[in-house]
């Protein structure tokens, strides 16, 4: 079973605002970042960090923490950010290591869904489409469905998906 996005919380503007406001807004050593975030949000590095990393809210590279935002953001900014990041979100994501053994190269999920719908206009079941694309059962479906609802090209209604006009 593949989890295209972690299950901690849904990728909503409100949750992105909470994550960004909790993260340090300046570059620092990975060690300082871990100490700072654990003091501010005990347990952050156990699960919440996954969603923050999956959404590109920060990166740690060569021992240096770099935040996406240098300031707190509001829900309008978070919504715009989610609308942008959903267009570039790929599977498998390095922060969701379970599953995805059948995928030879990463897929940009929104683009792959659009291409699938264009080629198979009678197929509308989102979970089935994602399962076909990732070549296994979809884990955390409600989380990926919520994330994809940020798309400006996909219309998601209950369990179905179509292209927006």
Describe every region a protein language model picked out:
Residues 1-165:
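Donor-sugar nucleotide-binding helix/loop cap in glycosyltransferases
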């Amino acid at each position: 079973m593949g989890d295209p996005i972690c299950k901690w919380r849904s990728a909503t503007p409100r949750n992105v605002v909470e994550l960004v406001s909790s993260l340090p807004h300046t570059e620092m050593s990975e060690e300082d970042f871990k100490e700072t975030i654990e003091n501010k949000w005990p347990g952050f590095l156990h699960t919440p960090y996954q969603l923050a990393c999956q959404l590109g809210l920060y990166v740690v590279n060569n021992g240096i923490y770099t935040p996406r935002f240098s300031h707190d953001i509001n829900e309008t900014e978070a919504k715009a950010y989610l609308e942008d990041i959903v267009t570039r979100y790929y599977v498998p994501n390095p922060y969701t290591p379970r599953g995805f053994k059948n995928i030879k190269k990463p897929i940009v999920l929104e683009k792959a869904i659009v291409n699938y719908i264009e080629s198979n206009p009678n197929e509308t079941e989102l979970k089935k489409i994602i399962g076909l694309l990732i070549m296994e059962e979809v884990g955390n479906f409600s989380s990926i469905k919520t994330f994809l609802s940020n798309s400006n090209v996909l219309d998601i209604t209950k369990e179905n998906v179509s292209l927006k006009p």
